[in-house]
């Protein structure tokens, strides 16, 4: 009897937890289709708020900036993070532990501290460049935004790719060298195919975090406006149903990216399990 009550309490807790997490999002999605501007009573279904987004030049401009920054920073961060992971994997155990702990600091560091510290660095550069003729007078704007996004994305790539490298059988790489491959060929034919799911998953994570970031972007964007900053500016005046529609689209896009990333990781896990059991892996 006690076990039955305990299970009921556990289920009730899980249900309450998910309601607490997702009811506000569900409420927002429902009222993004509301006919009226009010958010207390649903008066009818409409798509006009989604249509009006397509004619909002400020939102479209901010969306373009966010996508450009997310794609460019995700690609660069993925390349740098993968290269760093290869270097970390080749270190001794003690050195690898030290570098891993150092890399972990930006992940646990509050975003506001990261944003302000990067801003101070860019301001210091700007003051230094005033006395150097061949340096740009200012880089605040798209350059600083890209650097900031790359900086906070690289650790996530390292933590995603390094575990996969640890699982890699180094004998496969050595066998490729023995069979006549040079180090570059062995990397592209043996190592890269094995870690490519982790690399792609890391890229999707970087893309998600970059699109979603507000705090670090806010301090380092200059006059450039990303989508989260544009939404923040809109909410300071009034909460329009357009914001509900825009937030719903962002939620669906980010959720899709996360689901794709999780599906890839799950597929890779089952593939590894089949390989361990000696089954045919396709």
Model-derived features: where do they sit?
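Transmembrane-helix boundary motif in ABC transporter permease subunits
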Residues: 1-7, 72-103, 116, 120-123, ...
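C-terminal transmembrane helix and the adjacent membrane-cytosol boundary/short C-terminal tail
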Residues: 2-12, 162-177, 187-189, 244-282
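Interhelical loop and adjacent transmembrane-helix boundary motif
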Residues: 2-7, 50-58, 211-268
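Transmembrane alpha-helices
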Residues: 13, 18-25, 151, 157-164, ...
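Membrane-embedded alpha-helices of multi-pass transport/permease systems
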Residues: 23-26, 30, 79-83, 116, ...
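Short membrane-interfacial helix/loop motifs at transmembrane-helix boundaries
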Residues: 23-57, 121, 220-222, 275
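Non-cytoplasmic
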Residues: 26-37, 157, 198-232
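Membrane-interfacial helix termini and adjacent extracytoplasmic/periplasmic loops
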Residues: 38-40, 47, 112-150, 184, ...
């Amino acid at each position: 009897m006690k076990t039955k009550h305990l299970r009921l309490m556990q289920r009730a807790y899980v249900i309450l937890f998910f309601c607490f997490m997702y009811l506000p999002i569900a409420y927002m999605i429902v009222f993004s289709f509301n006919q009226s501007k009010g958010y207390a009573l649903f008066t009818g279904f409409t798509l006009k708020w989604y249509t009006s987004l397509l004619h909002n030049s400020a939102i479209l401009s901010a969306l373009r900036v966010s996508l450009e920054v997310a794609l460019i920073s995700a690609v660069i961060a993925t390349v740098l993070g993968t290269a760093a992971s290869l270097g970390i994997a080749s270190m001794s155990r003690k050195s690898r532990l030290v570098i891993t702990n150092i890399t972990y600091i930006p992940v646990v560091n509050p975003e506001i501290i990261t944003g302000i510290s990067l801003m101070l660095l860019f301001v210091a550069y700007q003051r230094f460049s005033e006395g150097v003729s061949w340096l740009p007078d200012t880089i605040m704007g798209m350059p600083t935004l890209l650097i900031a996004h790359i900086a906070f994305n690289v650790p996530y790539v390292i933590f995603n790719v390094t575990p996969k490298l640890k699982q890699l059988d180094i004998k496969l790489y050595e066998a490729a060298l023995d069979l006549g491959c040079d180090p570059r060929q062995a990397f592209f034919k043996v190592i890269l195919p094995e870690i490519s799911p982790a690399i792609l998953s890391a890229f999707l994570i970087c893309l998600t975090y970059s699109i979603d970031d507000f705090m670090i972007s806010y301090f380092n964007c200059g006059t450039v406006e990303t989508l989260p900053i544009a939404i923040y500016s809109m909410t300071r005046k009034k909460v329009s149903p357009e914001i509900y529609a825009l937030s719903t689209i962002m939620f669906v896009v980010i959720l899709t990216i996360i689901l794709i990333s999780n599906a890839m990781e799950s597929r890779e896990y089952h593939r590894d399990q089949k390989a361990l059991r000696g089954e045919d892996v396709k």
